[in-house]
């Protein structure tokens, strides 16, 4: 007999039971556990819904990874599996053989079905398989603990599809018996009120990544924010609100790209990224109030910060340990920046990246920030490009960076004296001014990578390089 014979015999036995419709809960109780995955795959492919229901009731493993088998949602299959679970969760005394703790609808574990399909069955003993299926990401439950259903949600329509609608309805009527767990929730299009109702049905501690995209308005932030306070394991919070037609692509890079690009990075944990919110005015406080854990990064782009919003930046513990602060395309020329200075003082010992880009900060406002900025000794990146400052104000700024020895990249605007009446750089004027600014800087420290003026260079398209002295492109 060949080495593949045991696997083949198990497969044939399961096929025979299915095709001759001999399958009952009693026959399943007598079958070896090795038969179940093969039989389940066979019943799944043959659309034997009654058999699926019975096998769920007798499932001998801690976890049923249905999502990796059901690549395309199929309502009748889901209904059959949930009917099988119905019989179990309603029983006070659970069947002798039942071990199922998790129904996994995530498309993440093809390994289970590959092993038991025979491709690698001989390299994995039943004992090893038992260890594999301990559901490491879910603590072992007691006899009367709720069943857990795992699924990742990506909501691209304003309403749920038929499978999700059925699943959420099924869970709603079994509160206390079933917990819906979603480690990642993405909302692209569902209205705010519907999304809040959906969040109420998800076990909040299970959410680790939450993305809310443009069609959800923040005009009712006070009603949305309390849900955040319940998400004790939340690591990534991404908010992008607005009504413009935009293209976003989520990627994972070792650093956050320039935020003018259409690429948004969700790499860093404990990051709050808010972009293009048309009506966040005086609502930012609601969000910060309910964030219990300190953020590592706070990124705010293409929006308006009212004075009250600016004041709250330094008041909440969630922003007290920032390593990265990016305020981009925010008009600040009439804003009181003393609260921002207070925030910089608070995070001076931890802040490594500071971006105040295209904020139209003017000389009086810049001077308010300088004392706090001079204390940010851990800064490695400082981007002050796109602001409206004079040459003397920039000199003052450079002198205040005396103690910032770790700065590796600095970007500054062309001073107002080098701009024409249209706001364009006059390179003949900028060149000697830039040289004078460099002399001022070298009096207090030696820079590494630094750039004055338009970024990138309008002539050659170059970005900051390793060179300290930049040539004037001809």
Curated annotation (Swiss-Prot):
Q: What are the alphabetically sorted keywords of the record?
A: Leucine-rich repeat, Repeat
What biological processes does GO assign it? negative regulation of apoptotic process; negative regulation of cell differentiation; negative regulation of DNA-templated transcription; positive regulation of cell population proliferation; proteasome-mediated ubiquitin-dependent protein catabolic process
Gene3D superfamilies, per this entry?
Ribonuclease Inhibitor
What is the top-level taxon of the source organism? Answer: Eukaryota
| LRR repeat start-end pairs | 97-124, 179-203, 204-230, 231-262, 263-291, 292-323, 324-347, 348-375, 376-400
- Can you tell me where the transmembrane regions are? none
One GO molecular function term of this record is: ubiquitin-like ligase-substrate adaptor activity
UniProt record similarity statement: Belongs to the PRAME family.
- Kindly provide the name given to this protein in its UniProt entry: PRAME family member 33
